[in-house]
Amino acid sequence: TLEDSIAFARLLKQEGIGLAVMGEIPLVVINVQRGGPSTGQPTKVEQGDMLTAIFGSHGDAPKVVIAPATIEDCFYSVITARKIAETFNMVVVVLTDTSLASSQQAFPRPQFSEAWLAPPIDQSEIPPGLKPYDWDAKTGLARRFIPGQPGGMHTLTGLAHDRLSHVAYDPDSNELGIRARSHKLAALQQTLKTPTVFGGDKGDLLVIGWGSTKGAIEEAVEKLRAEGRKVSSLHLTFLQPMAPGIKEIMQQFKKVITIEGNWSDDPKDEIIDESNRRYSALATLLRSRYLIDVDCWSEVRGAPIKPATIQRVVLEKLKQK
């Protein structure tokens, strides 16, 4: 199933997304971010939906979140998302934004590859005794039962259920299901490649970004490096789960900062201090996951962040002790 939605409309569909998580129904959701909250700025650029995409829905609802950086990335990200959704029986959110949605880019005509496809669905008769949610103890994966499949009759429900798909409210069944759905994220994470650093592998400052800010960040980093600054950048495509090796990359730099199009408090404001400062979305994730002091700078002016602005911000951060 493929669902395409602007950010505001997607919030109205959280119950359906939660059903897909609980029932382990493959689903790709394309979320085109724009200014919010509420009606906000319908035609303006913003990156305010990351945390909603990852944590949205009541209860524990693990989802994969991919953020393409270019028009070409958008094409291939949907292919990747569908393959992951069908391989792991999960919800995959493709998190794009108004900047990409309203842009045009020429790229080489794609040549079809068998690698794009998920493994074919096994539609053979279900062997006696095989359970519809026969979760693997390590990966959480289970064979997908298809409606109408011989021997595959089962209940598809948003209620907590056991391995037989029967509604079950007992503590053991509920915890077993949650563990299985969570382990699928870990199983996917182990297949991901460590992202490539743009610039040197170590230095004074690492800029981390996601989504459509990639071009502006790399242009700024390239100019700063031409001036002799020991600055590099890292752009993340997988936001949930995050690829392996990110912590080790960050540890090679004296300072780490995220550049994003969502809100973060300015520490220069009189009322803001370290006890009440709100960090940007990606900085919040990185700080909590890797326990590294990640700083952030963000802009929510309804327009793409400019390379010159990023250069200025990075130079200011380099001067700070």
Can you say where each PLM-predicted feature lies in the sequence?
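Short, conserved catalytic or adaptor-binding loops enriched in Gly and charged residues
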Residues: 52-59, 286-290
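A broadly conserved detector of short glycine/acidic/proline-rich loop/turn motifs that flank catalytic sites
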Residues: 31-34, 57, 70, 98-99, ...
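Generic structural motif recognizing short loop/turn segments at the entrances and edges of beta-strands
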Residues: 2, 46-49, 62, 152, ...
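Thiamine diphosphate
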Residues: 1-55, 64-86, 226
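Conserved beta-strand scaffold positions in the cores of enzyme catalytic domains, especially
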Residues: 27-29, 63-65, 233, 294-297
